Regions:
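Active-site beta3 strand of CheY-like receiver
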Residues: 44-50
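Two-component/phosphorelay signaling modules centered on CheY-like receiver
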Residues: 10-29
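Short amphipathic alpha-helix used as the core "switch/output" element in two-component signaling
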Residues: 39, 61-74
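Alpha4 helix (beta4-alpha4-beta5 surface) of REC/receiver domains from two-component response regulators
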Residues: 17-18, 62, 85-100
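Receiver (REC) domain active-site loop signature in two-component systems and cognate sites
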Residues: 55
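Helix N-cap/capping motif at the beta->alpha junctions
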Residues: 30-39, 60
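C-terminal output helix
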Residues: 106-115
């Protein structure tokens, strides 16, 4: 499985990649914002996207909107990992089509649980 991790904070990208590796996901790539990530997604065959919300250039919610508007990417599973904990933002992400939402800080167990739930829902669909 090919996973793209998008966050403007390199330490957070590294933390997420290490947690994913510990969960058995070793084919991971990084981008530092949505502007960098979108062409990578459009040109590569990614199976999963993990993105932050607050980033310069293109925010995670704008990246999510672009992914859902692209016929080739519309079904890409997206997990948002963010400090944004306001109810309105969680609702907006859900309405925009996010598959899962994790609020920072989080544990490996939380990340694993969210990823597994996303794949359970996809398998049932």
């Amino acid at each position: 499985m090919k996973i793209l991790v998008v966050d403007d904070f390199s330490t957070m990208r590294r933390i997420v990649r290490n947690l994913l590796r510990d969960l058995g996901f070793t084919n991971t790539f990084e981008a530092d914002d949505g502007k960098t990530a979108l062409p990578m997604l459009q040109g590569g065959s990614y199976d999963f996207l993990v993105t932050d919300w607050n980033m310069p250039g293109m925010t995670g919610i704008d990246l999510l909107k672009a992914v859902r508007a692209d016929p080739k990417l519309v079904n890409l599973p997206v997990l948002m990992v963010t400090a944004e904990a306001k109810r309105e933002q969680i609702i907006l992400a859900a309405q925009t089509g996010v598959n899962g939402y994790v609020i920072k800080p989080f544990t490996a167990a939380t990340l694993k649980e969210k990823i597994e739930k996303i794949f359970e829902r996809i398998d049932k669909a």
